[in-house]
């Protein structure tokens, strides 16, 4: 089975319900996918209930809050990472996933969508696009390996020096210098 992971605070800001609804759509097309929703937050019970209500609780795992080594082990064991955030100033977790070689699907509304190119970007509310992206990565080996390899290369090249230079350049252009 393929493993699709949502890792973060299980709160309205992170859009966990979109992940569960997309999972439901994926599982109507194939049963060889399992979903992991790692984290804690005020919507945890609601997500467990939603998975049960949709009849997909047997394909979901809710391990709770993770830190440090647990996070990296979870990401390395995953085939796809999803971050359907409604509001996300930046979002470091997709970079961590990509660094582990895990293809990522992120919200176009997240800050990291501005700098990442080797991932799939969807509108957070578009569960059809999210489901299609999950299904595609899980069932298209070429796409999986491309996102795995190129995503890792991309995040391995991100350094504070490069980010600082990019921000400086942005300010210079904005100020017309």
Where are these regions (language model features)?
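Aromatic "clamp/platform" in nucleotide-sugar-dependent glycosyltransferases that forms part
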Residues: 86
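Short hydrophobic beta-strand element within catalytic cores of glycosyltransferases
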Residues: 103-106
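Nucleotide-activated donor-binding/catalytic signature segment of Leloir-type glycosyltransferases, i.e.
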Residues: 48-66
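Conserved acidic donor-binding segment of nucleotide-sugar-dependent glycosyltransferases
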Residues: 119-128, 136-141
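Conserved donor-binding/catalytic core segment of Leloir-type glycosyltransferases
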Residues: 1-14, 20-23, 36, 148
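Short alpha-helical donor nucleotide-sugar binding micro-motif in glycosyltransferases
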Residues: 65-66, 73-78, 167
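A charged, aromatic-enriched C-terminal amphipathic alpha-helix characteristic of glycosyltransferases
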Residues: 142-172, 176
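Short glycine/serine-rich donor-binding loops of glycosyltransferases
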Residues: 91-94, 112
């Amino acid at each position: 089975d393929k493993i699709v992971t949502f890792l973060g605070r299980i709160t309205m800001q992170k859009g966990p319900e979109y992940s569960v609804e997309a999972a439901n759509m994926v599982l109507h097309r194939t049963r060889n996918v399992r979903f992991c929703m790692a984290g804690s937050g005020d919507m945890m019970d609601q997500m467990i209930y939603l998975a049960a209500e949709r009849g997909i609780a047997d394909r979901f795992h809710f391990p709770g809050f993770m830190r440090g080594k647990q996070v990296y082990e979870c990401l390395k064991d995953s085939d796809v990472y999803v971050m359907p955030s409604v509001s996300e100033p930046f979002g470091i977790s997709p970079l961590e996933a990509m660094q582990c070689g895990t293809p990522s699907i992120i919200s176009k509304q997240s800050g990291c969508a501005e700098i990442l190119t080797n991932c799939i970007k969807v509108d957070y509310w578009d569960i059809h696009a999210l489901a299609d992206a999950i299904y595609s990565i899980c069932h298209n080996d070429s796409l999986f390996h491309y996102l795995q390899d190129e995503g890792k290369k991309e995040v391995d090249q991100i350094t504070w020096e490069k980010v600082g230079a990019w921000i400086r350049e942005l300010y210079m252009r904005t100020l017309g210098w």
